[in-house]
Amino acid sequence: MLQLHPSEIKDLVLNGGVIAYPTEAVYGLGCDPDNDTAIQKLLAVKQRPWQKGLILVASEFSQLVDYVDESQLSAEQLEFAFSKWPGPFTFVMPIKPHVSRYLCGEFDSIAVRVSAHDGVRALCQALGKPLVSTSANLAGEDPALSGDEILNAFEGKIDALVLGALGEQRQPSTIIDARSGKILRNGQ
C-alpha cells in the first residue's frame, strides 16, 4: 500500500483510488465524491450498505455547493452551520438533484463537514473539492486509530494511506440536522 503525504494524493483519488487518512478523531476512508465506481469500491471495502449514505468533508463550504441545495435552507440555518465550522460538527443538508445515490443513500440529504483538521483540509485543498469520508473500519467494528491498524485491516483493499496525525477529538463529530436543528449524534 502506498504511503503518501496529502499533497501527493490528487491524481490517485481523481483516478478512482480509495485512501485512508487521519481525521479529527479516527482514521477515515475516502474517495472522489464524483466517481461512483470509487464510492462503490469504498462501500465494498467497508462492507457498508449504500442506503446509509456517506459524509463529505471539505476545507471550506464553497467546496460543498455542488452537492448541497442551499435554496432549501434559510439564512439562519446556514449561519448556524457556518458558526460551527471549521470544526467537529457535521450537518445534514438537502441535496441537489444530481447527487449520486451512493453518496446520500436513501435520503434526500447529505452529511457535510468543514473540517478544522489540518490534514483533512490539505487533502481537500489538494483535490480542489470535498472528499468522501467514513470511518476506517468494517461495518460494526471499531474505527482505526493508527496507521498500523490501517495497514493490517486494509492492505490490498485500498490504494493508499495518507500520512499524518489524528486530531485531538476523542469522539466522532456531532451530527446536526440543518433544517430542524435536531442533534442526531452527540459526538462531544
From Swiss-Prot:
PROSITE patterns: YRDC. It catalyses: L-threonine + hydrogencarbonate + ATP = L-threonylcarbamoyladenylate + diphosphate + H2O. InterPro entries: DHBP_synth_RibB-like_a/b_dom (IPR017945), Sua5-like_dom (IPR006070), TC-AMP_synthase (IPR023535), TC-AMP_synthase_SUA5 (IPR050156). The keyword ATP-binding applies. It comes from the Bacteria. It is an enzyme of class 2 (transferase). Keywords: ATP-binding, Cytoplasm, Nucleotide-binding, Nucleotidyltransferase, Transferase, tRNA processing. Belongs to the SUA5 family. TsaC subfamily. Required for the formation of a threonylcarbamoyl group on adenosine at position 37 (t(6)A37) in tRNAs that read codons beginning with adenine. Catalyzes the conversion of L-threonine, HCO(3)(-)/CO(2) and ATP to give threonylcarbamoyl-AMP (TC-AMP) as the acyladenylate intermediate, with the release of diphosphate. This is Threonylcarbamoyl-AMP synthase. It comes from Shewanella sp. (strain ANA-3).
